[in-house]
Amino acid sequence: VCFTGHKSLFGPQGTGGLCIVPDLDIAPLVEGGSGTHTFDERHPRFMPEALEAGTVNAHGLAGLAAGVRFIEETGVDAIHEKVSRITSQFEEGACDIGGVSVLGGHGGIDRSGVVAIDVEGVDSSLLGDALARDWGICTRAGAHCAPLMHRALGTEQRGAVRFSFSCFNTEEEVAKGIVALKESVNALR
């Protein structure tokens, strides 16, 4: 199993891991600089050093460890409950704006804090830019590396705007996001 540290584990970008069975014979893709056997002519063959090319990202791994500690201390259920609550708040507010639809449905769906919206007649890039420029709200606009999904949804020409919520967001921030979305959509029509 491979995982990235910056999605849901609150670690920095560039962190992650690989969980394998102890006896799996796996060869590294890239070899290089070993801090444990500096004068050996060959790269270490024992795990995990065999898969570590170059300097270990110690600062990043410390950040990942802090993120995992936060999850353990806060609790997965508490984090999930808050994210679900504020995500539902946003979905309900967004759907009250004429021409805005939540892609993938909403209401009662157990999912992450990621909400993609389609705004009838509004290019997603223009909306994303307006939210950033006028409101300081960072979203992701476009095709999200999924052009076939957008073709199936009928949004391949304008894309979608994706909002991402975490347990660190507040209900006040979500309310501001709804106001910003409504005003930005109205300004772009």
Each language-model region and where it sits:
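Active-site C-terminal subdomain of aminotransferase-like
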Residues: 9-13, 19-82, 88
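Short, acidic/turn-prone active-site loops that include or flank metal/cofactor-
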Residues: 5-9, 143-145, 165-168
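Short, flexible turn/loop "capping" segments at secondary-structure junctions
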Residues: 43, 60, 107-109, 154-158
